[in-house]
Each structure stands twice: as C-alpha cells, then as structure tokens.
Curated annotation (Swiss-Prot):
Organism: Pseudomonas syringae pv. syringae
Transmembrane segments: none
Protein name: L-aspartate:5-guanidino-3-methyl-2-oxopentanoate transaminase
Required co-factors: pyridoxal 5'-phosphate
Cystine connections: none
Alphabetical GO biological process terms: amino acid metabolic process; biosynthetic process
EC number(s) from the headed UniProt entry: 2.6.1.126
Length: 387
C-alpha cells in the first residue's frame, strides 16, 4: 500500500554511508532527544536496581594485556563454557577479542590463510548484514541458504556447499529468527563438514537466552578434533554490556595461536580495564538480565496474540521477534513511526537475505518501555498497515 501521511517524514537517505538503523538513531538523538522511544536494541537492558558494577583494577590501565587475553578473563570464560556445555576445554582454546564481530573477522581471515584462494562461504539467511560484508571484504564468494524453518537439515546445508567452500557460518540462537538447532543436527553436521574439509563457524552471542529449559549442544562436544571448529561469543548480548567491546573465540590451540598473532599485529591487545570488568561481570552472572528478558517476552507474547498473531509468534530463544508487518514500504513505515510517533524501529534493512516487510520487536527492554513502545506501534499499525 502507499502510506497516506498527513505529513511525510523521510528520514533515511539512500545515498548515506551509514546504515538505515544508524541514520534513524542519529535523527532521534539530534532531533527528538529525550522524547524518542528507542525500541531497536536486541541487546537486553539490565533492570535499574539490578545493574551490576563490575570490578576494575586501579592499575590495569598501566600495562598491556597478553595478546591472547588477560588470564583472569580467559579462566572465567573457559569455566563458563565448560560448565554451560559440559566441555573440557583449556585456556589455550580461547582468545579474547574486541567484541564478537572482531572475533568473526579474525576467524574468517584465519580460515582464508589455509588456502591459496578464499573460495566460498555459506551463510544462513536472513543474517546480520555486517557478517556477509566481512566475508566479502575478506574475499569469499557468498552462498546464501534461505531459512524456512527453525534450523535447516544437514542435507540442505551440504547441498549448497561447493567444491571451493571453505566455511559454513551459523548463528544460533538465530538472529533475527530466534530458532535453535537439535542435538541430532549438530552431531551430524560436525563430521559431515569435517569430511569435506569445511570449517564450521558458530556464532553463539545469544546463548544465555534459550527458554523453556531447552539447550543446544556445543560442536566441541561432537569431536576431539577442533581444528575445523570455531565458536564466537561476547558479553554484549549475553551480559548486556556492549560498551565493554569484549568477545571471545574458541577453537583448537593452533588456531587460537594463529589468531592471537593477527590480533597482536592489529591492536597489540584488547583493552585491559575492559577485560577486568568483563571477568568480574561474567563471574557475577546474568540472572537478573535473563529474568528481564523473560518478563518482556511475556508482554510481547500477549501483544502478538492480540494484534499480530497472523504475522509472528514468540521464538524459543534470542532477544527479539522478527515480525513481517502488513505494509508495502517498511522503510517508509519506520520513518513515519519515528517522525510522527517518536518510535525508533529496526527493520529488515539490518539484515542480508531478509525477505518481506520485517521489523524486530525487542524482548529485552524494561516492562515500562516495552508497554509504551508496543502501544505506539499498535497505533501506527492501526493507522498505516494494510490490514
């Protein structure tokens, strides 16, 4: 449909170097300031009274950390992953990075170094747009597999792999769909890719947010040979702390050593105070943050049931719902919601391979913000949607 505006708000410029989301955020900060209602983040927000105050050493700014990461943080990360997934990894299997995306960049380049040519990489779609951008910048030819269920079959993934495929990138719990895979899937996928010499890169930055007592199995539990396996994680989503810019990669000790050498060349080491705070934060745990998401999910579930039951349902994991709205021009709708209602939304433009007029509804904001944002969204849908 063509939106019938009283006043048309065109906020996004197609010729901008910035992402659509970043343009809307800048508009909200400069034009709306405190009156804007931000409903974009898939980073969960700590409840005010429960917000942690992680410890920072008074002397850690005066020294470089180890290029692999500060030992206290690596010990903490290793203990976390071993406890969560029943593993027996050691500190040598972990590398601290400047966030999850930096970890992916190191992994993609390290895999490329194994071959004279980059070859191709398989991505499940939709996928956060920065991931394929990184792969293409590294020299890979991208192959998309369009998701039609919570997770694909192993046969479907293998069917799109080519003779030159170097890696398969998976993101579970999935961003933005919120799906998780079965034990049988990962137990079959790991040896199947290994037989073909294809690396598996598993992005697990939402693994704290799997609900209803469900779990996923780590690929490291499926083999003793870790040379073709990489997992990437961070404190941004799982611990609600994107400002720390702390992530980690797990793989074989040889792979970790190679990536540590790359990291040393690029930035010497990751920020020492951030690592100290991250170790403290992970040790404290994220139970209040998890409960915040549980509470917000209940509000979003009720909203979807009342207003959008034809278009989306609550997924089993993650911190958002990807909703295909009944509008023809989703970017025009999002601009109008921002200009007229002050509601900042993230759309399908944030993802590659997304089909349809999607927005993401976050499930990690405090209840009051969630209620307010959903009411504004209801008004906008009632006024502009093709229903």
């Amino acid at each position: 449909m063509t939106l019938a505006y009283n006043k048309r708000h065109q906020i996004v410029r197609p010729d901008s170097c910035l992402s659509v989301l970043q343009q809307r955020l800048k508009y909200a900060r400069s034009e709306l300031q405190e009156s804007a209602c931000y409903f974009v983040e898939n980073v969960p927000v700590w409840p005010g009274a429960a917000a942690p105050t992680p410890f920072a050493a008074s002397t850690d700014i005066f020294q470089h950390a180890d290029c692999n990461g500060a030992p206290p943080l690596i010990n903490t990360i290793c203990a976390r992953d071993n406890a969560l997934y029943g593993l027996d990894l050691s500190d040598e299997n972990f590398l601290v990075t400047n966030g999850g995306m930096h970890g992916l960049s190191l992994v993609f380049r390290q895999i490329k170094r194994r071959s004279a040519e980059a070859g191709s990489a398989v991505c499940l779609a939709p996928v956060f747009g920065a991931v394929p951008a990184l792969l293409e910048a590294t020299g890979y030819d991208l192959i998309y597999y369009q998701m039609s269920a919570a997770f694909p079959t192993v046969e479907e993934i293998l069917a799109v792999c080519r003779a030159d495929t170097r890696l398969v990138y998976l993101n579970f719990p999935h961003n933005p769909l919120g799906g998780i895979y079965s034990d049988a899937f990962i137990e079959q996928l790991v040896p199947s890719l290994a037989e073909r010499g294809i690396s598996l890169v598993l992005d697990m930055v939402y693994d704290s947010f799997i609900f209803d007592d469900q779990k996923i199995r780590s690929p490291f539990a499926c083999t003793n040979d870790l040379s073709l396996l990489y997992t990437v994680n961070s404190v941004s989503k799982n611990y609600g702390s994107p400002g720390l810019r702390i992530g980690w990669v797990a793989s074989s000790s040889d792979n970790v050593e190679a990536m540590a050498g790359m990291l040393e060349i690029e930035c010497v080491a990751v920020c020492s105070p951030a690592q100290t705070k991250a170790a403290s934060l992970i040790s404290m745990g994220n139970a209040p943050l998890h409960q915040q998401v549980v509470s917000s999910r209940a509000i979003v579930r009720e909203f979807l049931g009342r207003h959008l039951s034809r278009y989306a349902s609550l997924p089993p994991a993650g911190t958002q719902v990807f909703v295909n709205l009944p509008v023809h021009d989703i970017e025009g709708f999002a601009d109008q919601m921002l200009g007229e209602y002050g509601l900042v939304l993230a759309t399908a433009s944030n993802y590659s391979g997304a089909q349809g007029a999607h927005i993401r509804i976050p499930t990690g904001y405090p209840e009051s913000i969630t209620h307010n944002a959903l009411e504004l969204l209801r008004q906008g849908i009632e006024r502009y949607a093709d229903v």
